Swiss-Prot record:
SUPFAM superfamilies: L35p-like
Assigned GO CC terms: cytosolic large ribosomal subunit
Organism: Verminephrobacter eiseniae (strain EF01-2)
Renumbered residue ranges of the record's region Disordered: 1-24
Biased composition (Basic residues): 1-16
Family: Belongs to the bacterial ribosomal protein bL35 family.
Assigned keywords, A-Z: Ribonucleoprotein, Ribosomal protein
Listed name of the protein: Large ribosomal subunit protein bL35
GO annotation (BP), single: translation
PROSITE patterns: RIBOSOMAL_L35
PANTHER family, alphabetized: 54S RIBOSOMAL PROTEIN BL35M (PTHR33343), LARGE RIBOSOMAL SUBUNIT PROTEIN BL35M (PTHR33343:SF1)
A single GO molecular function term of this UniProt record: structural constituent of ribosome
Top-level taxon of origin: Bacteria
Length: 67
């Protein structure tokens, strides 16, 4: 059986942490930000963990990550 390929789109967007969680960037931070308050933009900074309900999808997209 050949190896499963990693999804290139997931490779670019997610990083697996040593504890097995996956971190991702926040959405809604690309354009049309003038109507968004400074507080909203500040809360969208940085990275957050992928929710546990989506970890099954992560395991399929990143088969070599050991999730």
């Amino acid at each position: 059986m050949p190896k499963m390929k990693t999804k290139s789109s997931a490779k670019k967007r997610f990083r697996v942490r040593p504890g097995g969680t996956v971190k991702r960037g926040q959405a809604f931070k690309r354009h049309i930000l003038t109507k968004m308050t400074t507080r909203n933009k500040r809360h969208l900074r940085g990275t957050v963990a992928v929710h546990e309900t989506n970890m099954g999808s992560m395991a399929q997209m990143l088969p070599g990550a050991g999730l």
